[in-house]
Amino acid sequence: MPNFCAAPNCTRKSTQSDLAFFRFPRDPARCQKWVENCRRADLEDKTPDQLNKHYRLCAKHFETSMICRTSPYRTVLRDNAIPTIFDLTSHLNNPHSRHRKRIKELSEDEIRTLKQKKIEETSEQEQETNTNAQNPSAEAVNQQDANVLPLTLEEKENKEYLKSLFEILVLMGKQNIPLDGHEADEVPEGLFAPDNFQALLECRINSGEEVLRKRFEATAVNTLFCSKTQQRHMLEICESCIREETLREVRDSHFFSIITDDVVDIAGEEHLPVLVRFVDDAHNLREEFVGFLPYEADAEILAVKFHTTITEKWGLNMEYCRGQAYIVSSGFSSKMKVVASRLLEKYPQAVYTLCSSCALNAWLAKSVPVIGVSVALGTIEEVCSFFHRSPQLLLELDSVISVLFQNSEERAKELKEICHSQWTGRHDAFEILVDLLQALVLCLDGIINSDTNVRWNNYIAGRAFVLCSAVTDFDFIVTIVVLKNVLSFTRAFGKNLQGQTSDVFFAASSLTAVLHSLNEVMENIEVYHEFWFEEATNLATKLDIQMKLPGKFRRAQQGNLESQLTSESYYKDTLSVPTVEHIIQELKDIFSEQHLKALKCLSLVPSVMGQLKFNTSEEHHADMYRSDLPNPDTLSAELHCWRIKWKHRGKDIELPSTIYEALHLPDIKFFPNVYALLKVLCILPVMKVENERYENGRKRLKAYLRNTLTDQRSSNLALLNINFDIKHDLDLMVDTYIKLYTNKSELPTINSETIENT
């Protein structure tokens, strides 16, 4: 069997990394010699293919002159190597051994008979080979291009070999199989354990793949067939080729937008997931994942690398970028804002917008530069994740809600449904949290102090204790109450931004009123904060939570007898004022004049046009996109025809209500300027993807991160997994690899590494 040496009385295993193991040769004559010298009768009736696939001999059975170490990492046999060193008698001294291979001593007549049989079989095979060689196919000759030099046999074999390696890597990516099979601390010292890549490679060898078998039949089996460096280079090429398929469509579409998701941990390093939005040839708005960018702590360096990667490495022309959006958690918001501003300086039409997949209130809360807010948001996410760990925890919370809201069954039912969803990303998340807080505290207390009837394991009880301590801290109470009240002014506005196209259009007109309300709050912050603090105090009293200043501040004030600072004034200066100021400024930044002009152009959508009684002025707002139009001089006349078309439509014709519907109109090609404008508006990150089939990039990204352990994540394999349905050209991957590494030592013509323990 492959894990054991096939020689009689030899108990060595191929998992020992300090000793090379070799396959039986597939050459009939050499294989026959190996079998004869082994003196194992049970191997005589097996074919060379079977022996090559299932049996091994360790290096102890070969003269040292037969073993060639071409480098410290490569051990191979010479072409004429024959095993000659065997122990055929030690089993006689231990007749009771249960784990020795049984040996049948062959007589000279038996050996001569077997030799004659093997010679006859070899002769028949040679005759068949000669017959086939005398009748070559004419088609192969005709297919040769006179202007291209034909590949040598070695070059063809090397390309087929590389193609097999790339096939395995693509398979591993699509099926989300990590490269490493075992953790380093799982493998005992001195043992060889193949990684997942090598295991799949050996599987294909044993399944009869000729190219791989020929390449590795003389190579020690307990070696790395493909080094980590080679694997990394091939993975980079796989990633690049798969990404290029998407980027080619983006370039054909011309216009696109860039979106980044929250920073993620890839094998211990922080990365930014990057997605692109574009309209494909079938007029469908698509949002596709194109890769990870290493995150930089310095915002200016991050901005430079972000731009360089997109333009130089990925080959996108940022002159065609019409939108940019960044979904990040609290600690990264300010840095991504620097990235956005640097891109805007170079490309003014790359409008900085909100992303449709993130609620405005959630986005604003994450951007608030107050430590207490960041801590509170993290606690909220942990509480939600805790109760979603198991159905039993959600049922426990449901029962507490039923008791607390027994006089309002409808509200109880509504809250239960909300708790079973990912409610932390909702527009009204803080209102929900304030309503649920008592139920959450009582439920967590119940888990901590559960009686013998309901038992939770130590981990659940421990997490419940930590979370209960966090949500019953007065600092947390004040923070969520202030956020609830401040963000109540933007809730309806944000909800409309994620609504229908007409809702988005009219939301743009309501921004002035929202800012006016927030400015009024800022002017009267003393009064507003007094009400907010009173609400927080009442909630704390209801939950029997002591009202106190944060411990860090109290320790700093020790010995300061002149300090007259109260809890109310402390939270006004450190929480309410900076939060309101930041939200006002953030709304002004995210809804710039260009952004609002773009949203005003949504009156091109026929249903919006109808609500405005066809009295619209798109031409004025569309000036910013004039250079994007195929025939800008005819825009005015074309817009007039577009309005007349829908104003005088038939009674049975409904007005298209979305950009998606308008782009798929059969006669849209007769309105080239309108079509161009709709395409540009469609790719703005603030516009939602109407057809969910084309929003797979983000969903698959979330699924990959959810289903893959942090230390097993790979930025290369992630792209293959997320874009598993994108076609791939193995020949292109092979040609690219040969072009890049043909003169380098890591080209897999020297491909085996023996694992040494130094």
Swiss-Prot record:
One of its GO terms (cellular component) is nucleus. The modification Phosphoserine is found at S563. Keywords: DNA-binding, Metal-binding, Phosphoprotein, Zinc, Zinc-finger. Residues 116-141 are annotated as: Disordered. Upstream regulator of interferon-induced serine/threonine protein kinase R (PKR). May block the PKR-inhibitory function of DNAJC3, resulting in restoration of kinase activity and suppression of cell growth. Disulfide bonds: none annotated. It comes from Mus musculus (Mouse). It comes from the Eukaryota. One of its GO terms (molecular function) is protein dimerization activity. Interacts with DNAJC3, probably sequestring it. It holds the Pfam family THAP. A zinc finger (THAP-type) spans 1-86. This is 52 kDa repressor of the inhibitor of the protein kinase.
